[in-house]
């Protein structure tokens, strides 16, 4: 019997593989992206201390209107502003195993425009 591969399991496997090579420090934390069917979530994480330094998501009150891509742009802007306010200017971008396209790319571009370097 032919079975269809589970896209999320493949993404999780890809994410685990990339996370083995990618890590955030206090000087250059990791900007992690998680994308669900309804929302998008971004966190700036110091992996050495195991602490989230800044975060933003579509659950925030500032991000209620628009298409999913427009919401991703607002989330990118918010996470960048919150990170810059805490003195973080450079990050390592972790796309979470997703393709660098669509909502993930929109979030990354908005974060770059608002002061994060990666």
Swiss-Prot record:
Region span, Disordered: 1-24
One annotated GO biological process: translation
A single cellular component GO annotation: cytosolic large ribosomal subunit
Superkingdom: Bacteria
Keywords of the record: Ribonucleoprotein, Ribosomal protein, RNA-binding, rRNA-binding
One GO molecular-function entry: structural constituent of ribosome
Family membership: Belongs to the universal ribosomal protein uL18 family.
Function: This is one of the proteins that bind and probably mediate the attachment of the 5S RNA into the large ribosomal subunit, where it forms part of the central protuberance.
Name of the protein this chain belongs to: Large ribosomal subunit protein uL18
Organism, scientific name: Streptococcus sanguinis (strain SK36)
Gene coding for it: rplR
């Amino acid at each position: 019997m032919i079975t269809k591969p589970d896209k999320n399991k493949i993404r999780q496997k890809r994410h685990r593989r990339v996370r083995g090579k990618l890590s955030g420090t206090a000087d250059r934390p990791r900007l992690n992206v998680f994308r669900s069917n309804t929302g998008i979530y971004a966190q700036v994480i110091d992996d050495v201390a195991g602490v989230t330094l800044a975060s933003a998501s579509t659950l925030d009150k500032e991000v209620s209107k628009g298409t999913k891509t427009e919401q991703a742009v607002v989330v990118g802007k918010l996470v960048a502003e919150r990170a810059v306010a805490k003195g973080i200017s450079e990050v390592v971008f972790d796309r979470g195993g997703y393709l660098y396209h669509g909502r993930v790319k929109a979030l990354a571009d908005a974060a770059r425009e608002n002061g994060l370097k990666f």
